[in-house]
Amino acid sequence: MAKSVVIAEKPSVARDIARVLKCDKKGNGYLEGSKYIVTWALGHLVTLADPESYDVKYKKWNLEDLPMLPERLKLTVIKQTGKQFNAVKSQLLRKDVNEIIVATDAGREGELVARWIIDKVRINKPIKRLWISSVTDKAIKDGFANLKPGKAYDNLYASAVARSEADWYIGLNATRALTTRFNAQLNCGRVQTPTVAMIANREDEIKNFKAQTYYGIEAQTTNQLKLTWQDANGNSRSFNKEKIDGIVKGLDKHNATVLEIDKKQKKSFSPGLYDLTELQRDANKKFGYSAKETLNIMQKLYEQHKVLTYPRTDSRYISSDIVGTLPERLKACGVGEYRPLAHKVLQKPIKANKSFVDDSKVSDHHAIIPTEGYVNFSAFTDKERKIYDLVVKRFLAVLFPAFEYEQLTLRTKVGNETFIARGKTILHAGWKEVYENRFEDDDVTDDVKEQLLPRIEKGDTLTVKLIMQTSGQTKAPARFNEATLLSAMENPTKYMDTQNKQLADTLKSTGGLGTVATRADIIDKLFNSFLIEKRGKDIHITSKGRQLLDLVPEELKSPTLTGEWEQKLEAIAKGKLKKEVFISEMKNYTKEIVSEIKSSDKKYKHDNISTKSCPDCGKPMLEVNGKKGKMLVCQDRECGHRKNVSRTTNARCPQCKKKLELRGEGAGQIFACKCGYREKLSTFQERRKKESGNKADKRDVQKYMKQQKKEEEPLNNPFAEALKKLKFD
């Protein structure tokens, strides 16, 4: 009997699909049943070949050999995962297999993972596509009942290949040109470089900012009411101190007459459902989680616990076909503290409206929402529980009615000047009940603060006991943190050097710099390349990052290039542009930037050379700030030796409770805190043993230290290493 091979992206998803399809016979890298053989990739198993596979001379990085422009880029099996590639290949080539079902992640990159494997195997069998947004049993069954023809995704595949090949031509050539021309480990790309440029621009804004003092007036009445002065244009601030001084002097011994009490009934609706970027922003603001960390937690909740839908989505809406599943999802997530809230929603028919249901705003995947899967909180880690809480509360909030309140504005006259006060009376808590009325609106910047207003009638006279001048200073723009950098990457139009509205709109509609799936990796890569560094929560550009921006061609610094590329990649995905035309343009552009770098007369200066020599090659080591501590890195790219000098750990200072830094090597390591606290590693081990009731042994401490090291080191797995060399996205 003929069978179908199902290619999943990861083993965990493959196991879920195999269970639903009753494939319980285990093989080498696959699971088999009567109709289906389920096998899996491990992320990418196949990638674009290194330059040296085209010509042995490219093994050495020489400026005169650039640009490297092979006529056709080749695919190669990633060495570290070759065993699994061969396992997939053997199943695809079986004579009893007459169909391939692509079940990798439903998106551009997922399409590439499977199609590159199929292309490398050189197999020509009919392809079908499984396109689902969650991996619950129900979603898998429904997906297999509605498989799509593979041909429907040919253009999406062409778009994914075009992006990868363009990044190879431009990224590898620009990086080699910069590194060999300026004798420094420099890398750039169409997303990395403009992101660094945005951080530099923000620092320049802060540096050039000149604070101005502004002035206002506040009147306090005997019934504890605070009144705020406003000019004829409704402004509460003035930069003219003399003017404010004069007004204050003229108001002495005047009382306030109530001219008007304006009552307005207002509504506010819940913020939209989460896409990945919005979730990463909130997790960073509330819990300090990095974008990468939030994505990893979401992946667990999606794949392992099966309680949330696909994380790598750029939509904040659900499609109309999902509305019918909402009651089941509410029942599933309506446990524990969420039970009364979910029960309240289920009492009435769910009203689907355009604020969260819009087919036109859902492309590959809908917003992140709970699945119909069983929720077992005892299996969650603390971090998983926090992320799940964010998603469930947002899901419940959009299903609750609007927050309704009465806005009261009190307008008074003191002398000849206008003073106002504002208050709010809640009429119906609505969606804010989900957040126990503690939801904070980020955009509230009004100088007139809301207060509890006493009972007052129009025409009343209020006794003024104090009139005082207030003052403040204008603030410089805040430095980027991971939350605000994600926002800037998502909508970088203010940093573009073009007035082309269509291009700006395309950048906005295609999600800005990078994609929801790649932004976390891009930020991580910038930290690991020492182009940016973290001080507290703030992100700073390094000297290396500054110099890179001075050395790269101007176009590579602007989001405009990404806007143009995304416009064309979108056209390829829609079948409106041939991949070959786009790649031809990219090759020509590569020639231009390599030529510009070659002819540059600028110099790169290492200003972080340490007194230490590299133990491998003897060259001076560079001292750099890694994401979680200081490191020594060999300045020779081909050597690549690096070593931790210190790293921030999760151990807390017993005096000030801040995170301790671990310095030194071996038995001589010490924990140090900014407050001045110092503790030897051996003493720390003894203290931990006592605190845990003598249960901790040497193995426990070693395990703890190993975990710290694992958290500190950059992502290092076979596909990450291969992709690090080839993808500059």
UniProtKB/Swiss-Prot annotation:
Its EC number is 5.6.2.1. The active site is at residue 310. Keywords: DNA-binding, Isomerase, Magnesium, Metal-binding, Topoisomerase. Residues 686-718 are annotated as: Disordered. It comes from the Bacteria. Signal peptide: none annotated. It catalyses: ATP-independent breakage of single-stranded DNA, followed by passage and rejoining. The keyword Cytoplasm does not apply. Belongs to the type IA topoisomerase family. This is DNA topoisomerase 3. The lineage of its organism: Bacteria, Bacillati, Bacillota, Bacilli, Bacillales. The gene is topB.
